[in-house]
Structure formats: C-alpha cells, structure tokens
Amino acid sequence: MVSIKSVLAAATAVSSALAAPFDFVPRDNSTALQARQVTPNAEGWHNGYFYSWWSDGGGQVQYTNLEGSRYQVRWRNTGNFVGGKGWNPGTGRTINYGGYFNPQGNGYLAVYGWTRNPLVEYYVIESYGTYNPGSQAQYKGTFYTDGDQYDIFVSTRYNQPSIDGTRTFQQYWSIRKNKRVGGSVNMQNHFNAWQQHGMPLGQHYYQIVATEGYQSSGESDIYVQTH
C-alpha cells in the first residue's frame, strides 16, 4: 500500500457539506464529525481519548467518533485515509483493542503513531487486507510478543507529508504473522525490539489504534483501552 500520511497540524474544513453516502448517523451529535462524502480532516479529544483523522479527499469515506473509546470508518472506492482513537502522547503502554475490521482490498488495522527528533512514523500491524506492507520494506528481524511472531521492517519516505509538513523520514513496522482483530499490544516490547535493531524513536506525538485504507472499500468499528 502507498503510505498514507497524517497531515494533522490543524483541522481542515471541507468547502461544502454533501449528502452522506451511507445510512450512517453519528451517535454523539455534539462531538462526532458530521456525515459527509468525505469526513473533514481533524484531530482532538473525544470522551477522554485522542482522535486523529486524515483523508486525501478521494472516494467516499466516513469517520465517526462513537461513545467512549469507539470509532467507526466506512469507505467506498476511496483514495488514501488513516484515522482512529488513542492517546497523546504515545508511550510504551499495553493497549487492549477489539471490534470489527473488514477491508475489501488494501487496508491496515494498526497501532499507529509518530515521534519527533527523529521524525518517525510507526506501525504495529495487527491485520491487513490484500497488501502486506513489509513486501516493499527492508527486513530487520523477528521477535515474539503478545502470543505471536512479529516481523520488523524499516522504510524511508522521501519528501512526503508528515506531522511537520513535507519531510523525509523513516517508517518502522512490526507486522503480526497471524492476523487478528482484538487483543493486547505491549508497545514497550515493540519499542525495545526496534531499538535493538538500530531503529530509535524520539519524542512521542499521538498513538492511536488506526484504520487505514488505500484505493479500496470496507468498514471498521474499533474500541481501544489500556490495562
């Protein structure tokens, strides 16, 4: 999948509201993003959880913050998008998550975040659709945590959108061998494994359990929590 960047320095408004492509009504009208063909880019806090949402505007994609730590994404013939709920800043916390993830084509379900100094975009891939992102990245090693094997990869993005504008930066990947949609992710174990393979992190920005898609359709309904 083409990497999908979160350009999230500020919420970006869509010029006009359009009819919702899905029969999909926000559960919390005071805080949920309005139903539109493409949900406007945004980040902030909702019911005590940090959320982040970005789309390139292609296709039809709807992100909605639901009650508590839940969110939902529905997409059809979309371009690039990534979004979800979690925390800011990121830490080595153990994350519990669950729900539903059904991509028809390219899609990821991942713990997703960024650091600065160095600028790093990272993924712990728990499930994916038709494309394994490790196929175009450099393999660094394998380790075992949370009941399964994870393969570690690194890749470099040149002059691409980031949380700090257009920059060159590295992407770190842990990809679970056996896909799942629900369980615990010990982020400190991933951070330690990356460090052991010469992949240092910097100052943490946000850390979310994200749904990501590229030129695909599908839906997800995910909740997050910590121990």
Swiss-Prot record:
Protein name: Endo-1,4-beta-xylanase 2
Principal subcellular localisation of the protein: secreted
Listed EC numbers: 3.2.1.8
Signal peptide start and end residues: 1-36
GO cellular component annotations of the record: extracellular region
Organism the protein comes from: Humicola insolens
GO BP terms in the entry: xylan catabolic process
Similarity comment text for this entry: Belongs to the glycosyl hydrolase 11 (cellulase G) family.
Function: Endo-1,4-beta-xylanase involved in the hydrolysis of xylan, a major structural heterogeneous polysaccharide found in plant biomass representing the second most abundant polysaccharide in the biosphere, after cellulose.
Residues linked to a glycan: N29
Active-site residues, Swiss-Prot/TrEMBL: E121, E212
Keywords linked to the UniProt accession: Carbohydrate metabolism, Glycoprotein, Glycosidase, Hydrolase, Polysaccharide degradation, Secreted, Signal, Xylan degradation
